[in-house]
Amino acid sequence: MAQTHSFNGRKRVRKFFGKIPEVAEMPNLIEVQKASYDQFLMVEEPSGGRPDEGLQAVFKSVFPIQDFSGASMLEFVRYEFDPPKFDVDECRQRDLTYSAPLKVTLRLIVFDIDEDTGAKSIKDIKEQDVYMGDMPLMTDNGTFIVNGTERVIVSQMHRSPGVFFDHDKGKTHSSGKLLFAARVIPYRGSWLDIEFDSKDIVYARIDRRRKLPATTLLMALGMDGEEILSTFYKTVTYTRDGDNWRIPYSAERFKGMKIISDLVDADTGEVVLEAGKKLTARAAKQLAEKGLKAIKATEDDLFGSYLAEDVVNYATGEIYLEAGDEIDEKVLKTLIDTGETEINVLDIDHVNIGAYIRNTLAVDKNESRQEALFDIYRVMRPGEPPTMDSAEAMFHSLFFDSERYDLSAVGRVKMNMRLDLDAEDTVRVLRKEDILAVVKMLVELRDGRGEIDDIDNLGNRRVRSVGELMENQYRVGLLRMERAIKERMSSIEIDTVMPQDLINAKPAAAAVREFFGSSQLSQFMDQTNPLSEITHKRRLSALGPGGLTRERAGFEVRDVHPTHYGRICPIETPEGPNIGLINSLATFARVNKYGFIESPYRKVVDGKVTNDVVYLSAMEEAKHSIAQANVELDEQGGFVDEFVICRHAGEVMMAPRENVDLMDVSPKQLVSVAAALIPFLENDDANRALMGSNMQRQAVPLVRAEAPFVGTGMEPIVARDSGAAIAARRGGIVDQVDATRIVIRATEELDPSKSGVDIYRLQKFQRSNQSTCINQRPLVRVGDRIHKGDIIADGPSTDLGDLALGRNVLVAFMPWNGYNYEDSILLSEKIVSDDVFTSIHIEEFEVAARDTKLGPEEITRDIPNVSEEALKNLDEAGIVYIGAEVHPGDILVGKITPKGESPMTPEEKLLRAIFGEKASDVRDTSMRMPPGTYGTVVEVRVFNRHGVEKDERAMAIEREEIERLAKDRDDEQAILDRNVYGRLADMIDGKVAAAGPKGFKKGTTITRELMTEYPRSQWWQFAVEDEKLQGELEALRSQYDDSKKLLEARFMDKVEKVQRGDEMPPGVMKMVKVFVAVKRKIQPGDKMAGRHGNKGVVSRILPVEDMPFLEDGTHADIVLNPLGVPSRMNVGQILETHLGWACAGMGKKIGELLDVYRKTANIEPLRQTLEHIYPDNDRNEPVRSYDDDAILMLANQVKRGVSIATPVFDGAVEADINAMLTDAGLATSGQSTLYDGRTGEPFDRQVTMGYIYMLKLHHLVDDKIHARSIGPYSLVTQQPLGGKAQFGGQRFGEMEVWALEAYGAAYTLQEMLTVKSDDVAGRTKVYEAIVRGDDTFEAGIPESFNVLVKEMRSLGLNVELDDTREAEQPALPDAAE
């Protein structure tokens, strides 16, 4: 029993307050990245060939390529990847890109073309593999290594392709009239806008160019005026009836009309409805039922109608009237004169059906398809004379050519849904029907039927993840390549070439490199802590190529939308100009194949909530009524209340329980990972929750990580999915453990083709992108049995597999002498001395020795004019030792650079005479520690160019590395031997031998004792009589030999890589990288924060004895200002304080029971208390089943404080907190009497005290504060530069000048503006004066004045400073005279 628990005891056990069971598994948090890129690359080819997506689709869309004459064709067959040349760690160390070579099989077909008939016949086919550049691979953690740094490709949110209907909200025209518009957005290709103007004419725009009447576009599609009208309007037939006319009666047309003149039945002549009455829908229907067929109409009723068809004299072909002409007396007379007895008019009543298309046709000057095409051509290519062919080709290529225009499957699906079409989703171009449907829909909207689209709805925005972004980029590269290939195919003798000769893969490789190196979406990974990594990978940006820009994005795009629920976090977004444009994916959300974000829901069947989970996108969700996860359910899963709060079509409402058909899976599905880590999130104001989730990402990993007492249950998930903590790949038994690696002998998922050993290399003191320290520590001991997925090593900011960003500290909420004014934080010295908030940061320094014009630079210990004292940390090669403590200005790597010949001073001549050449012609360009940094050297790496001789240090590093590799190989070999020989012994034990090693009698039974007499390598010589078994033995032998060969080959390959020279930038001969670890204790000026957006700066560190203390002498660690709570409305921190206090109280109780156990050896009270704290639930293994060792292990783990989990929106309530405080024997007020550490007197009233989880943020005073001594000056103004990086000064600005003026400090002011800033001559004189010990100096003219004079001269004003002072002043007239 102890064996099975030895490991479980080392997982953190939490008391769960959540009441809602978790039905759905949370998807892997970096699935977004990995799934997308895997789908793009498809490294392994499936058995039926690859489907048409990702890289395959790109190749399929560009190939086959034909030359201009059609005499040859280059076809794409398939692609495959070679294994990557370097693994992830090697790429990190050598500044390389982690990638795999892409090999593409191409087929060149050459045709014979018959000159007479033009028939083609195949003349020659050649197939060849062509190298097409390297494809970056994704690491297991969803990142890319580009030039040695880890980068993340952020997913982009953009407007989904498809058709959108919108209006201008009445802003365009002064009358406030709504102008409707439709826009067809393809995935790539020209946009088509169709819009109304203020006069209700319909216009079309292509690619936001000049507008054309929409009918021009329809004519270009091959329609004429009559066809256009018949498409958009029904017709009504007026039939001549004596002097009057009759029209067919339809209830649909007449309902809701107010009758102007009597309605007369055309057949009987009776009045069916008198003038002035309104015809209701019911009355209209009744009239039809009574048998009203037609009604009388007068000529006045005809006036103002429009003809539905041309009136033509068929004998002569003369057109009297055209379709669409308005009927007036003259037109009617013409109609009657031609003897027409039936007139078809358009069914337009200007109320339900407007005459927009007819009016557009009337203003359109184009009459035919040719004119329309020419008009479009002139708009798209102004200045070029159109011909019918070129106009037709251009129009076709705009919307109907799959090379140029692609709606994408998403666009087609969206378009079908919006317009009720049924085209296949393989039809990726526009069709005539689509354009007609769009115009029809737009006219319907204008007539007041239908709804406009909401572009901020997540059904209309989709996510482009890595794979898709990469696909687009690679397509661009291939298209650039295509042009070059076509030209080469035409210019070269095609019969003699191979595919290789036609292809230059540079453009494709360059496109990939450019994307990873410089795209706005390829970002330097935020690696401050595991949470910031995971959040960065789950980020959704609306910016970037093809997206929005900060300046143009309005309020609507940034705002929270009802469809964000369960898809995008409403809380986590940056403060500042990017607010709302950069979002985070919600915890349970995933992206579907069309790029829409889906959220999971439980199905409700017949009023019972089931455990079936469905994922729905925003569009699919709109038709459902969805209950919240915290709705009360009975035993059978039915709703308790008659009416249930639910969401339907973006509104929150109370619905009868029968109508509810879905339910949320978890309360935390609406927030992101970072927000789900904040306990009592529901009690915090949204603005502070936003700061809280953003600041957790800036928490620096501390030297001793400690998981929070008050967690939310998300901590282990983040630690596991981020890859910070190492999870076992398969079950097994721990064979070896040390600080740098864990060796596990696998017992589960054994695969003959793979090794039976898993070696996990731990990262020790590696530098992250943000210079924080990545260090992993093993959690297992030799002999532990572990299962797949168990956490076997902790990483940065993790504690027993839980995310641990900060520390639990004892907080008192009270003012203390003004030291916590304005959110300042007062700390106890104990926190500094116990290294509670100490972190390690690793700085990287790099120096390169180049080949210069004057000769090569050299890395050496032999540096001119440097004392032996300054070289004490360098080895003979001139590189600092590992472990050396270095200070500002210390030499890390000695380097000398040849300098040009200049005339020599006598001293130099003397030196040259004594020491020979060396002394004069080199200068010291060593790499030194920058000012203000102290630390310890933890690692040195030396890189040499191929063929450059290695120095002693490089050889030593190489030897170490090879020893490490050999140890790995030997361990793996030993475990392999143990496994294989164990199996061999089992197989032949007790069998009769048919043969054996030398001196062995045939026919003897083989026993284990007998085997021990021979060396293991001779056991293979035993043969048994059983043929089947003998076959198995031989198979085992060959498998063993293969494994051995593979191991050796792998080892030799790695050694060869270590010994080989490195790829270097041009001109670099040798490069040294030095890593210095800096220990940063917390100090005044450092920024700290809790998880609820309660941030502050450390103002003072007090001696422990001055801190307020409790009756039992416990001192507070930290004092916060209580005024920081009410106005900020983040009450969550107070609840956390109380609950943390209860946790610590419980822990103390368990500590006392442990002492009792040590004295009496009675474990029962301890067991009972732990069973009371951790009741049986489905989250943890029941404590009742623990054996004594496990109970003790758990007790030791929780004696500082019991860990609890209070999930967001489903956490502990006030009653739970009170119950815990009571259990711990504490006051339910959560307040205690505190005593002043300085006087020992109690404070006037009780103070809230408890444990809060505090973080130290990555805004450290050491990185910010700096002081300038002598440094660089700006070239033009001659003023000191600004900023710490430039070693700059502080700007003495306009307002500071006013301050000194107000004090009347004239001399100080003059000094500030001259000698301390940009009076070039003056500052030199001051320096000399100070050196002499003299304190008189004179200010001159500041350089900025000269700049002003020059500026004025550039404007044509010649200004000169007249500084010739009168030598003698004229004598004043004497008063006596």
Curated annotation (Swiss-Prot):
Catalytic activity: RNA(n) + a ribonucleoside 5'-triphosphate = RNA(n+1) + diphosphate
Record keyword Nucleotidyltransferase present: yes
This protein's GO CC annotations: DNA-directed RNA polymerase complex
SUPFAM superfamilies assigned: beta and beta-prime subunits of DNA dependent RNA-polymerase
Family matches, as PROSITE patterns: RNA_POL_BETA (PS01166)
Its EC number(s): 2.7.7.6
Single annotated GO MF: DNA-directed RNA polymerase activity
One Pfam short name: RNA_pol_Rpb2_6
Keyword list, A-Z: DNA-directed RNA polymerase, Nucleotidyltransferase, Transcription, Transferase
Ranges that cross the membrane: none
InterPro entries: DNA-dir_RNA_pol_bsu_ext_1_sf, DNA-dir_RNA_pol_bsu_external_1, DNA-dir_RNA_pol_su2, DNA-dir_RNAP_su2_dom, DNA-dir_RNAP_su2_hyb_sf, RNA_pol_bsu_bac, RNA_pol_bsu_CS, RNA_pol_bsu_protrusion
Annotated GO biological process: DNA-templated transcription
HAMAP family: RNApol_bact_RpoB
Family: Belongs to the RNA polymerase beta chain family.
Function: DNA-dependent RNA polymerase catalyzes the transcription of DNA into RNA using the four ribonucleoside triphosphates as substrates.
Quaternary structure, from the entry: The RNAP catalytic core consists of 2 alpha, 1 beta, 1 beta' and 1 omega subunit. When a sigma factor is associated with the core the holoenzyme is formed, which can initiate transcription.
Protein name stated in the entry: DNA-directed RNA polymerase subunit beta
Gene giving rise to this polypeptide: rpoB
